[in-house]
Structure formats: C-alpha cells, structure tokens
Curated annotation (Swiss-Prot):
GO terms for cellular component: extracellular region; host cell; host cell cytoplasm; host cell nucleus; T=4 icosahedral viral capsid. Residues 1-19 form the signal peptide. The record marks R183, S184 as: Cleavage. InterPro entries: Hepatitis_B_virus_capsid_N, Hepatitis_core, Viral_capsid_core_dom_sf_HBV. Homodimerizes. The gene is C. It comes from the Viruses. Residues 178-205 have a biased composition (Basic residues). Sequence repeats lie at residues 184-190, 191-198, 199-206. Residues 165-212 are annotated as: Disordered. This is External core antigen. Pfam families: Hep_core_N, Hepatitis_core.
Length: 212
C-alpha cells in the first residue's frame, strides 16, 4: 500500500499524499489495521509521540539480538514473529526504493520529497510496528496493551492532574493496579488439622509418673 503511495507521488503531475490515499480507497475500499488482530489499533499507537520510538536501526538491532534464530527459522513461531519478518522486509524494500529514487530521479525537489516521505512518514510506521511486536515478545502482549491504555490515559489527562512522568513499560507489571477481568483472588482453603497422638500435657504427666 505504501509503495503504491510512492508510485503515485512519483508519477502524478500534482503529487499529494491525500490524492494517493483517495485513489487507494477507491481501488480497494478496505480499512486495514495491522494491529487489530493483536488487540490494539493504529489510533492507540498514535498516543505515543514520534520521539518515543527508537530509530529503525536500533529496533532492527534489538530484533536481531533477541529473536534472530526465530526470525530466520522456516517454521511458524508466532504471529508476532511473522509480523516482524514482514516489517523488516518492507523496510528493506523501502530503503532500496529510496536509494533508487535518489540515484535516478532528476528533479531535486521531487527526489527530496520522496526520500523525506520515506524516512519520516513511512519510517515512523515501521518504527511503531517494530516496537510493538518486539515489546510483545519481550514483555507479553497483555502487558503491552495495558501499557498503551495507561499511557493513553496519562497523555490525555491535563498536566495538573497527572503524575509528572509517563508510565514505563518495563516497570508496569510491578506498579499496575488494574486487575484482569474474570479472575478473582484465590482463597486458600484451611487444611484439615492432623490428629496428634498425644497432647503435650499428657506427655508431661506420663513422664512425671515414670520418674516417681
């Protein structure tokens, strides 16, 4: 989809991103959200500011360090690994396209427009995807979803009524007060008392009689 946006920008005489999106909606008429099957949404991810996400290079290094074996495996490991593979391949193709445009597009203004669009707009979307799936594999999907809700509540609360610092994902499981639905705290049933063969008093009386 994003590659088609770029093709429209390059080929149109009056290129606009809005026009390419309208054209795509007319062609397909689909509203695809890459986070929907994981319980999140593009809107929820948009609560996090753009400078929150590490660079693509750092995220790719993290994915390689933590999940390289699973990402290179021919077997299906998890939906998050599959999504990571697709995002990594997509970013690689975008870099190839940006390099090709920079080398072959004669108009400097158009060349700068395309390269900037790839690095800024599409780069942010790839950073969001990489961060989400790496975090789900590291901390667990439920923890990441709780974090997104907590951050969304924090960022939309007026500064005078919220804590000075935003929630931190790595410490969320220790500080969260939200209880999971459908689970009640377990009550320990009292264990049956064991019968004592002889009470302490009886033992003492027997010992005294033996001494006499």
């Amino acid at each position: 989809m994003q590659l088609f946006h770029l093709c429209l920008i390059i080929s149109c005489s009056c290129p606009t991103v809005q026009a390419s999106k309208l054209c795509l909606g007319w062609l397909w008429g689909m509203d695809i959200d890459p986070y929907k099957e994981f319980g999140a949404s593009v809107e929820v991810l948009s609560f996090l500011p753009s400078d929150f996400f590490p660079s693509n290079r750092d995220l790719l290094d993290t994915a390689s360090a933590l999940d390289r074996e699973a990402l290179e495996s021919p077997e299906h490991c998890s939906p998050h690994h599959t999504a990571l593979r697709q995002a990594i391949l997509c970013w690689g193709e975008l870099m190839n396209l940006a390099t090709w445009v920079g080398s072959n597009l004669e108009d400097p203004a158009s060349r700068e427009l395309v390269v900037s669009y790839v690095n800024v707009n599409m780069g942010l979307k790839i950073r969001q995807l990489l961060w989400f799936h790496i975090s789900c594999l590291t901390f667990g999907r439920e923890t990441v979803l709780e974090y997104l809700v907590s951050f969304g509540v924090w960022i939309r609360t007026p500064p005078a009524y919220r804590p000075p610092n935003a929630p931190i994902l790595s410490t969320l499981p220790e500080t969260t007060v939200v209880r999971r639905r459908g689970r009640s705290p377990r009550r320990r049933t009292p264990s049956p008392r064991r019968r004592r063969s002889q009470s302490p008093r009886r033992r003492r009386s027997q010992s005294r009689e033996s001494q006499c």
